[in-house]
């Protein structure tokens, strides 16, 4: 809204922007993590919005960010929170990052409020890693290692192969991508190795 006034403040290593039109944006200074909320109700209320309509609305909001979406695909939709997730894909597999690199969360509530989470740092052209190929275990072995570590298997919602990002030691502008299994545990995606190690370490 061109006529609204924007207020900026710094708090706990993050920059917060608000205006009198019901918009709020928080940027974490150390990693470019962005959380944007719009309470202006630009979208009509709908208690029983269909999946088709929800995804159309979320993708329309995503396009308004004016970012390159060449490698970005729809990943999943949470019916309870009305949250749609879009991720960057490489060779058919998603990048799953705690810092939201390459991913976009778009939530449109029944009341019409909008909430977007993404990173200011977009992924550019992927380049092959110099390291040797990674040999992943089969899914049965992954599930068995989770079970043996004492994980509550009832809390696992999904398992899939994806790329884990890590900082490149030679350049701050490059991230390394390593294939691994991700487990959706308590509705949070986590590398299965971290889940196993955390559980074993808590014993």
Residue ranges and their predicted role:
Residues 22-27, 41-48, 91-98, 123-128, ...:
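Short, surface-exposed beta-strand/loop "edge" segments at domain boundaries and coil↔beta transitions
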Residues 132-203:
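Hydrophilic extracytoplasmic domains
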Residues 1-64:
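Preferential activation on post-signal-peptide N-terminal prodomains/segments
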Residues 107-138:
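Short helix-loop boundary/capping segments
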Residues 60-68, 145, 149:
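Structured segments of extracytoplasmic/periplasmic soluble domains
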Residues 2-26, 68-111, 160-188:
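Exposed beta-strand-loop-beta-strand "reactive/processing" segments of non-cytosolic proteins
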Residues 25-37, 98-117, 189-203:
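A short, surface-exposed beta-strand/turn
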Residues 87, 116-119, 184, 193:
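Beta-strand residues in well-ordered beta-sheet regions across diverse protein folds
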């Amino acid at each position: 809204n061109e006529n609204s006034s924007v207020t900026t403040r710094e708090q706990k290593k993050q920059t917060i922007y608000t205006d009198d039109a019901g918009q709020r944006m928080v940027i974490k200074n150390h990693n470019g993590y962005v959380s944007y909320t719009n309470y202006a109700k630009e979208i009509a209320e709908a208690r029983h919005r269909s999946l088709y309509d929800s995804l159309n609305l979320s993708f329309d909001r995503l396009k308004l960010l004016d970012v390159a979406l060449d490698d970005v695909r729809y990943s999943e939709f949470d019916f309870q929170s009305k949250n749609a997730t879009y991720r960057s894909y490489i060779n058919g597999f998603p990048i799953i990052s705690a810092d939201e690199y390459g991913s976009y969360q778009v939530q449109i509530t029944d009341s019409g409020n909008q909430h977007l989470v993404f990173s200011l740092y977009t992924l550019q052209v992927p380049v092959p890693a110099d390291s040797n190929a990674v040999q992943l275990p089969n899914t049965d072995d992954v599930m068995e290692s989770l079970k043996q570590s004492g994980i509550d298997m009832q809390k696992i919602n999904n398992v899939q192969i994806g790329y884990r990002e890590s900082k490149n030691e030679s350049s701050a502008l490059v991230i390394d991508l390593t294939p691994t299994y991700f487990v959706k545990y308590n509705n949070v995606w986590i590398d299965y190795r971290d889940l196993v190690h955390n559980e074993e370490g808590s014993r």
